[in-house]
Amino acid sequence: NYEPDVLVEDITTLSHDEWKLYRTLGIGGSDAAAVCGISPWKTARDLYEEKVHKKIKEQNDDGWVAKEIGKRLEELVVQIFMKRTDTRPYAVRKMFRHPLYPFMISDFDFFVKLDEKIYLLECKTSFSYHHMNGWEGGNIPPHYVLQGIHYMSVANVDGIIFLCLHGNHEGSLI
C-alpha cells in the first residue's frame, strides 16, 4: 500500500505550456495507449518526440477545439453523475508520480468515495458518431482502459469510473 508522490502541488497555477513541460517528465495515462501502439491519436514515435521536446509547439494547436470542449464539459459531466448517484466527487488538482515507478505520472479529473472505497472519475465527451466506437453496450475503448489502469496504479485507488457524455442531454451520459 502506498501514497503517490506529488510532482506538482497545484496544476491550476500552471500555464498550458508549463503543464505540457511537466508532462515530458514521464508517461501519463493518456500516453499509455501510444506506448502500447493502440492510440487513435498518436504513435509511439509521436510520443517519444513529445517527450524529448521535438513536437510540443506543434502539438499545442492540434485539435485544440475538441480538447477545450472536453475540458470545459468535465464539470457538467460530473454534475450529471452527481445527480444520478447522489454522490459528491471532488477534485485534487495535483500532478502525481508513482513512488516505485517514477516514470509514471498523472493528474486526474475527479475522485469519488463509494461504499468506503476511493475511485477515480474520468470524464470523456464525444459528439461524433465515429468517436462513439468502442462505447457500445457499456464497453470502454481499449485505449481508455489502458489510461484507467495507468491512473489506478499511480493513484493506488480501488477503481476507476469512466463517464462519457456523447450528446447534448443528460440521458446521453454513459
Residue ranges and their predicted role:
Residues 45, 78, 148:
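Generic structural marker for isolated residues within well-ordered, non-membrane alpha-helices
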Residues 70-87:
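Signature of the catalytic double-stranded beta-helix
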Residues 22, 33-35, 76-78, 160-163:
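Intrinsically disordered, low-complexity boundary segments flanking structured domains
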Residues 67, 84-108, 112-174:
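Nucleic-acid nuclease catalytic cores
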Residues 1-72:
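Charged, glycine-rich intrinsically disordered N-terminal tails and low-complexity linkers that flank
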